[in-house]
Each structure stands twice: as structure tokens, then as C-alpha cells.
């Protein structure tokens, strides 16, 4: 059905281009000019809206729409619509000023139909089930065009033409708006925990631009049919400017503790004690503190007024020689959360400490070094492995035996067991150069105390109590030990 729909649309477009045969080249030129203008308008719109999103992010007003979604529509939606209309208004005045208004209106409809038909054919060929959405955007507009062609060619853009046109577009527009709303319902909460490196305003602005382009694809031709777009442009520009001023003023607070519609800021706090050992097993560095992850692009900027000691002066330094920056991650998402904070705190002494033992070091027939370990501790532990320069982790006793590196080249394993379990035994095998005076691998183990009497220290509990009610916090204690072999 998709191929049949695309074939009918291509037949319609071919017939339009070939009438009359003496103007085939001229008709093709006009069609591809309209196609090029559509692409230019999309690029200009995306660039403009992303610049606005970057500005909002730089001034520290990111996620202003997190609780008030309508803000994103008035900020980015109006900017996108205004830019699209402006580009085509300029094209109308510069390229089509001496033409009958019906001609550019007709040619831009055909350009939109061609874009959707090509998309339908390509997506169907790729075997993607979502091709039926493109089929909607080909079949319904084409049927509508055929039904109102006589009315349009004889009388122009009458009220009857507009009403029939809108009615014909009702099904694809309604379904696309439903899908768009579903996408925004999914992505808006995700932006609240997308990390410190991805500007959420840029992501949402991009989604709004794509939605605007799709929904306006068959209405661009109306810009060439109406006498003036001045009133529309002024209205959209005024709405955008007012919204931008309000966003810059900080009137739209990102988070909410409303029980009916909660939009909390997620915060993870881990009271951690760290010990770094050298090649001889001696502790060369140790510290203790509460490690804080803000989870979104705003970091801790909104928390600082409530808890002044949590500020940018305590940004966590990265331990370059340690895997995952020497921090007890529970998931390998360090590349998404490069900005985190480390508040000095007393050392924790768990009642059920971790025990890490080297069982053996042996050379294999393949000239590899195999290290065997025994670990006992709480029910949840993380293992971090970083081969040194010149070394490589070839195999291990975990999973299917094939190590898979995380982003950055380090290896991560999350291990958990029941309340009563025997010690965890595993081995790693590394290929290494003959001379390795500084060791061949750095291996770290973290113990996470998610429950029980070791879960929260008094300092951690006190800090959690001071967080504002619009935060959703998770806190636990953990230890981190780094070894070099």
C-alpha cells in the first residue's frame, strides 16, 4: 500500500511537470527551486531557534519549561513559526513578486508532496513500520488537492477552498499532533535527568522545530496566497519577545513539588570514603566526602541558595590516573555527568566492610598476565578496570568472557547478590609489555550500602533533610578502593 500510494503521487507530480511538454525543464526548475527554498527555510529556522536555546542556556535559565511546558511553545514554537513565515515571505517578494499568486501556492504544495513521497518510498524500502505516517501525509493531501483543484483554479483561495483544504488535512494533522505530544511527554521528564553535558533547551527546541516543520509543510503555500503576513509576523514576534523577557527574568522556576503534577529536581548524594593504593599496596591518598550529582543541566545552581556550602567551589576534581575519575559510579554514565561536587565530610566506617584479596598472579601460555581475585562485601558492588598504556584487557571470567569498554576506554561491572552469599571470585587476563615498572592495570572496587544501618551517615542524613521540597533525592554510603597491579 505504501508503494502504491507513492507511485500514485509520483504519477501526479510527473503529469504536472509534463504539462505542457514544451515547458518540462521550466517546470522542473520551478519545482526544485521550491524544494530548495523549503530546505533553506528549515535550516534557517533550526539555526535561529538553536541560537535562542543556546542563549537561554548560557544565562542560566535552562529548563524554564520543565514545569510549565507552554513556555517552550511560546518561546521556541513562535520563533520557529515566525522564521519559517519570514523566509517564505522574503522569497515571495523577491522571487515571485510578478507571478500570479496561485502559481507559487500550487508549486509549493507540489514541493511538499514530493518531499513526503520521497520520504515514504525511502522509509518503506528500509522496512520501517513508521512509514505509514508518511503515507498519511501523501494520501490525504493528494486526495484533498484533487477534490479542490477545480475550485482553486477557477476562483482562487476562496473560503470554501480553505475549509475543504483544512478538512482534508484533519486526519494527518490530528494524528501527528498526537504523536508529537507523546514525544514531548516522554522527552520532557528525560531532560530532567539527562546530565550536565546535554543542553536540554537545545534538544527540546530541536524537537519543536521538527514538529513545526512537519505541521507547516502543507501550509507554506498559504504564505504565497495571502496578501500580507505582516500581522502574523508581528503577533508571533511579540509573543516570542515577551516570553523571552519573562524567561530571562527567572519568573518560570523549573521545578515543582506539586503532588498532583510533580516536577522535582533529582539529586544523588553518596557519602564516600576513598583510598588509593600504589603498586606495593600502600595507601598513597585517602579522602572522604559527600559526592553530589545534580542530574540535569542546571547542576546545583538552584540548590545553593538553600544549602550555601554546596556551591561551585567544591567541584569534584577528576583523578586522571584512576578509572572513571576515581568516583564510585553505579552506572557507566560518567561522560554525561562531568560536573559534580564533592563536599568534604568525616570518614565512614561500615559495619560490613568490603574485603578485597588477590588470590594469584600467573603468566598464561599466551604470555598474558592473569590476576585472580576474591571479593566479599555488601549486596551491591561496582568494579572498575583501566589497563595501563601498552596493556590490554583480553578476557575475563565475567559474562561471555569478552570485555566491552565503556566510553573513554575503562571497563565497568556492577555486581549484586542476596543478603547471604559466598565471596565473589573472578579473574582478568591482560596482555602487557615485558617491562611494566608502573603496573599493567588499575582496578577499583566500590561497595554501595543501599539499605540497612550503614546506608546513611549522620552527616548525609542531615544534608538530605536540608534540601528543598522540590528535590527528589537519593542518598547512600559507599567506599572506594583503587589498586595497581
Where are these regions (language model features)?
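Extracytosolic and intramembrane catalytic regions of membrane-associated proteins
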Residues: 272-485
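Alpha-helical transmembrane segments of integral membrane proteins
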Residues: 2-332
